[in-house]
Each structure stands twice: as structure tokens, then as C-alpha cells.
């Protein structure tokens, strides 16, 4: 029962934080690709031969096709349907990996970017706690509007952070 509840939380959380991360040209798609590549590499290190890794590659190819038209200035928008589909696919990938907790570091930038807003609203609605008031959410809005980052800087810097974390995951597994 507890595992089922945790699965629901993982899937719901992944869908919503990925959806909240959408909003800067290429950001959500690029971070999703980095996360999926991380799971792909981990699955190969763990020698998971169930065929799901092929689906991961297909999803990456689909997102690359989308990113071709979503690069700044975007000519194609993902919308809720696309970002939610990516979120559910990431959560299913985490579950299929056999180590759902790997979702946290593998998608840490998505979690922080989208999750901060969910946390802020939840604290206000449920407990009337007004912390994080000086932080705009999602986090990509904060760095663009309060720190002066351009859309491209935001996308590249967030991607670099996720690549570094993903490389650390792979390095730990290879040791």
C-alpha cells in the first residue's frame, strides 16, 4: 500500500514539476533529454535488457524533433499535453529502472525549477505559511527576471547543472 502511494506521488510530482518547467524555449525538453539519457546510461550499466531502453531512445528522438522547432525564437510550443507526457514518461522510466529514488538526482533541476512553485503554493494554501516570497516561481522566472539571465542563459546554465549531476550519478555507478 505504501509503495502504491509513493508511486502515485512520484508520477503526480513528475507530471507537475515537468509541466511547471515548461516556459523557456527549449528548457523542459532539454532537461528531459538529459534526464532520459541518464536513465538510459544507468539501465545499460545495470544491464537492464527489457527493451524499455529502446523506448527511451524513441522518446529522446521525438523530443529532439520538437526542439528543432522550439529553439529560440520558438516556432512550436509544447503546451501542457507535451510537458505532462514528458513528466509521466520520466516517472515511468524511473520506476522501470528498478530504482525510483534515482529520479531525484536524475531530474534534480526539473524538480527544483518546477517543484519550488508547487511547494510555495502548497505552504500558502495548506498552512498559510508565506515563506519564499522573495523568490519568483518557477525558478526559471526568478533567474530571468531577478538575476537578468536571458532565456538562452537560463536554458544552458540549467542544462549544465543537470549534466554535472547526471555525470556524477554515472561516475558513482561505474566505481
Where are these regions (language model features)?
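Alpha-helical transmembrane segments
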Residues: 2-7, 11-175
